[in-house]
Amino acid sequence: MAEPILQTENLTFRYTTEEGVAPTVLDGVSLSIRAGEFVAVLGHNGSGKSTLAKHFNAILLPTAGKVYVDGMDTCDEDKLLDIRRRVGMVFQNPDNQIVASVVEEDVAFGPENLGVPSAEIRERVDQALAAVGMTEYARHAPHLLSGGQKQRVAIAGVLAMRPECIVLDEPTAMLDPVGRKEVLDTIRRLNAEAGITVVLITHHMDEAAQADRLIVMHDGHIMADGRPEQVFQNVDGLRSLGLEVPEPVALLYELRQSGVDVPLTALTVDECAGALAKLLTE
């Protein structure tokens, strides 16, 4: 079994304000994410999911407890560069991460700051753009791209740093359905084909359903942790947290409430149709 690339031990965090210390945002969170996993972290605004994400590459440091990246303590200043090389971050608004006026120059920005030789930078840029399907836009101006394309450029900029893990904090929040699909397809491909560990912070049920593992957060605590088809079976528990379930699960749940014996493990429309077809032929 792969070793943990991300690990928290009783992680507690409180923001400091001018008035003093604010309420606890993360309260004793302990989890372990292994190399190669695709993990979605689901929760409402204020659940602590984005604050947790910012601990994974030491943007934030614990008030109490520990965070380890590939065994390195994020509070160890001497390890900060190594930690950020291993874990890349992608945020909600791609415009806040794009720094150059040409796509390929933007993707090259990170490696240049690491002192990577020019020939290797060229190779990294080409590979990163190919990985996100943006090669043909290498010489385009980023501001002329669609939202989904901009976010893919932001992901390419992180990939050019050669991280072992990418943490994406609500990367589709500002995108239309087409842009969302572009970004989600890219994330899944990077995990499946390149073996990059992915942590996706989201409040979209359909996005969370695509992960291999789902962590549900509420009020700074982990409320559930398992495979999506397992977590989403607890319809009443999720609804008590103000969360919904994917539409196929909701449909099957209503059928079950009416006395129809159907499983709640179908997360997609096709899986739901298959479950209903099987029911009708029995």
Language-model regions, residue ranges each:
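Catalytic Walker B motif of ABC-type/P-loop ATPase nucleotide-binding domains
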Residues: I166-D169
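Conserved ABC transporter NBD signature motif
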Residues: G65-C75, I83
